[in-house]
Amino acid sequence: MTESVLDYMTRLGRAARQASRVIARATTAQKNRALLAAADALDAARPELTAANEQDLANGRANGLEPALLDRLALTPARIDEMIEGLRQVAKLPDPIGEIRDMRYLPSGIQVGKMRVPLGVIGIIYESRPNVTIDAASLCLKSGNATILRGGSEAIHSNRAIATCIQQGLAAADLPPHVVQVVETTDRAAVGALITMPEFVDVIVPRGGKSLIERVSRDAKVPVIKHLDGVCHVYIDVAADLDKAIRIADNAKTQRYAPCNTMETLLVHSAIAERVLPPLAAIYRDKGVELRGCAQTRALLGAGVLEATEEDWRTEYTAPILSIRVLDNLEQAIEHINTYGSHHTDSIVTENFSDARRFLNEVDSSSVMVNASTRFADGFEYGLGAEIGISTDKLHARGPVGLEGLTSEKYVVFGDGHVRT
């Protein structure tokens, strides 16, 4: 009799729960040995990885997959190099598990502190990019968590080949293979099962399109670490340095269009708009960026700027399109960001300390910046070493989620025969 999807996922969940108890007590040396051995296994398996990936690419082309998605799916030699180096870099990161902080003596005589511990079992759901398999597996392993990885069906052969290398790394460190498991069925029912197993899964991390994340957020019976959109802003204040403003607004939009930390709306103080918008518009037009603006923007820049609609202010384009709005003061800029933004990343360009502090205090986003491009909102750029994603939620992890974001804390108490009176 064929095993049902629910039975299969339950089997994976049960095995992950058992493995989570083993990896939680693994030593730092043991975890690092697994990561380095997995890196060596990937290096040795380049022909197998390439063959598996070619099978996925052929299937993708046959199924009419868009060129951009085919590019994300491809495991080029350079991307395999990056995966190998990624494993080695995670092995070098400090191990957060077991760290005790804030120890203090209380009047009762007991000593109380907090110890950092793994979350347990992490389910990760993602699309297209097989390199996410390595990113997710390595961070979960180093943080002492077991993980169940459900990649996109278009990358199934690549993910299986990568998983084989990870299993070899686990075996080399005498760790159970179920510490990292890849879902090998392409049946979409596997996602529904994974997000509704609170007895086996402690948290879900979805990485992909908005529809996937909305579905997971709506249907999950376990906590979810996620962000829906990346509607990021740069506000050019009246006290901005013009050279800095132009450089930042250019980079935030045009360095790359697809990432979630790319600027989608540019806000400009009316007193500086006439000096900063024309040179910026020339840069954007040279780079093929379509401009959509408010009435003041269109009056200033003339023909070629489309009228921005209410929907534009809320849209993550992930394309060479930019909305521009001219405002009269900082208060209006903050109000616009908190109304239309996605609580991801927003930046102010200003030389006024009070304006900068007010922006930092009042903008309700996971990353708030002063005189820096929104493109810096990234775990690597923040010195986290790597990230599993970015969270715009307010509970547990917020912003780029690195090793520490995949852990929790428990109180530890030391006494010497103390009893409560």
UniProtKB/Swiss-Prot annotation:
Give the organism the record lists.
Answer: Pseudomonas fluorescens (strain ATCC BAA-477 / NRRL B-23932 / Pf-5)
Compartment annotation? Cytoplasm
What family does the entry list? Belongs to the gamma-glutamyl phosphate reductase family.
A GO molecular-function annotation = glutamate-5-semialdehyde dehydrogenase activity
**Keyword annotations from UniProtKB, A to Z:** Amino-acid biosynthesis, Cytoplasm, NADP, Oxidoreductase, Proline biosynthesis
User: Which reaction(s) are listed as its catalytic activity?
Assistant: L-glutamate 5-semialdehyde + phosphate + NADP(+) = L-glutamyl 5-phosphate + NADPH + H(+)
In short, the EC number is: 1.2.1.41
Q: In which pathway does it act?
A: Amino-acid biosynthesis; L-proline biosynthesis; L-glutamate 5-semialdehyde from L-glutamate: step 2/2
Segments forming a coiled coil? none
One biological process term from GO is: L-proline biosynthetic process
Q: What does this protein do?
A: Catalyzes the NADPH-dependent reduction of L-glutamate 5-phosphate into L-glutamate 5-semialdehyde and phosphate. The product spontaneously undergoes cyclization to form 1-pyrroline-5-carboxylate.
Q: Give one Pfam hit by family name.
A: Aldedh
The record's GO CC annotations read:
cytoplasm
Write the protein's name. Gamma-glutamyl phosphate reductase
Q: Cite the source lineage.
A: Bacteria, Pseudomonadati, Pseudomonadota, Gammaproteobacteria, Pseudomonadales
Which domain of life does this protein belong to? Answer: Bacteria
Main location class: cytoplasm
